[in-house]
Amino acid sequence: KDLDRNTRSKSALENNPNLPIFIMDNFETTIQKVYDMDPNRIESITILKDAAATALYGSRAANGVVVITTVAPKSGEVRVTYNMVGTISMPNLNDYNLMNARQKLEAEVASGMYEAEGEDFWFKKIRIEEYQGKLKNVREGVNTYWLAKPLRTEFNHKHSLYLEGGNEEFRYGIDLGYNNENGVMKGSYRDRIDAGFSIYYTTSKVQVSNYISYGVTKEKESPYGEFSQYTKMLPYERYKDDDGKMLRILQWSRVLDFEPYNPLYEADLGNYDKGQTNVLVENLSVNWFIKPTFWVKGELGISHSTGKREAFIDPLSVKNNLEYGDDRTNVGSLTLTNTEYTSWEGKLAISYNESINNHNINVGGGLEVKTTRRRTNTGTYKGFQSAEFSSPEFARSMPYKPNFQEVQTRLFGIFARLNYSYQDIYLLDASLRIDGSSEFGSDKRYAPFFSGGLGLNIHKYAFMEKYDFVNHLKVRGSFGQTGKVNFAPYAAVPTHEIDIDEWYISGPASSL
């Protein structure tokens, strides 16, 4: 699960642009798909990090490439494989060596927190009353260990079922999976159900493989908020009143700048942040063997996903950030976000491999096209009377304009490669790829990526035969160029923003 850290260091930037690309069975996939898949379905994983190895992937490979090959269905009788993995997730707070309530108050006294010089009578009086209030809580046995309040220990389970069969000419495989993952933060979870169907058709001249999958992921954030909030809490702070009800406001612990609210009170309200994602993937690959040494390969990949997210703030929540005299008819809010993502990927490649005497030549080339489109719309509704009625139809108003966004990218690339060896001792590798992308600036629409390498298999020399304890000794060197687009798709394209709040005789205002 640490591929994103081990291949290249993580970035603190949003969406982690330092992630490598993941290629599964020759098609690009997401890191989430890799995390969710059954490890028993993986035949091999190859991590490409140096420029010479990644140059053929062009403008996407600057952070490395993770190539994954899955296990193909086996011919013969129908086989059913079931796998279940259970894990226990528990928080580890051993690294937090915190003071208890009495120690914290004694440390404040020792630091002179309540003995500031030069203050007038009223400031001194406030400090004394604050100290007396904290001391009263300590003497009454208040010693709240806030770090443990939002946490829990969970048993998670992951199930996978695989059915395979067929004959030498036609094989098929059906995979089903369910992943239940509850977080250590109370109320958080991520559940995923997916299914896939693969077929392999093979003759002496043609090889066809197709894989289609569909997955549904449901997730929910913890109503207890961020764990970092609880690290700021003070142990002598009460979180319940004498009747056992949650306190809305705390006395001394400040979580937000505007008000020291109680996060445990917020957890008892109707706040929620949840979402669902549906993903459909279709991958088709066709190999045509014109000759044993010459073949053509075509690939087509289609991915379509839809997502919906709902974030609701209870009208009783402190997060409404109301001040005295504010209009309370607009308390409570619901933010709905809908996303739609479509990706088309096509590739056509030819390859020729020939051995002539002591010479072995492998050459190939091809082209690749890819287009993606993402649509997002977001709307916020305000003015709810109760958390029990959080549907948009119960909202009082929609104070902000809905936000609609569409982002589309296109990529076209051509590539060529050469692998040559003489007597399997002297090795030569070279590759070239030229990418054209809508994300590049208009002054330079195309970018070249090349690599070259030399190698020497010393263990293949005749004089090495007497050193039977050496079975592999190789010297190699390589050079390559990589690159990556790290800015927004339209950052290199002049765009106009229309301001419908400013109207002139000629129409609405716009800015470049």
What kind of feature is each model-predicted range?
Residues K1-D25, S44, T54-K74:
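Extracytoplasmic beta-strand/coil segments of soluble accessory domains associated
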Residues L147-S222, Q229-D241, T277-N283:
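Transmembrane beta-barrel wall of Gram-negative outer-membrane proteins
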Residues K1, L13-N16, P20, G64, ...:
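Residues embedded in well-ordered regular secondary structure
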Residues K1-L3, Y35-N40, Y57-A62, S188-R190, ...:
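Short, glycine-/polar-rich solvent-exposed loops and beta-turns at beta-strand/coil boundaries
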Residues T7-S11, N26, K49, T70-A72, ...:
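Flexible glycine-/small-residue-rich
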Residues D95-I128, G215-L256, A311-I313, R373-T380, ...:
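A surface-exposed, glycine/aromatic-enriched loop/edge motif typical of exported proteins
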Residues P20, D25-A51:
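Short acidic/polar hinge/loop motifs at secondary-structure boundaries
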Residues H157, R192, S198-V216, D257-I313, ...:
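Extracellular/periplasmic, surface-exposed regions of secreted and cell-surface proteins
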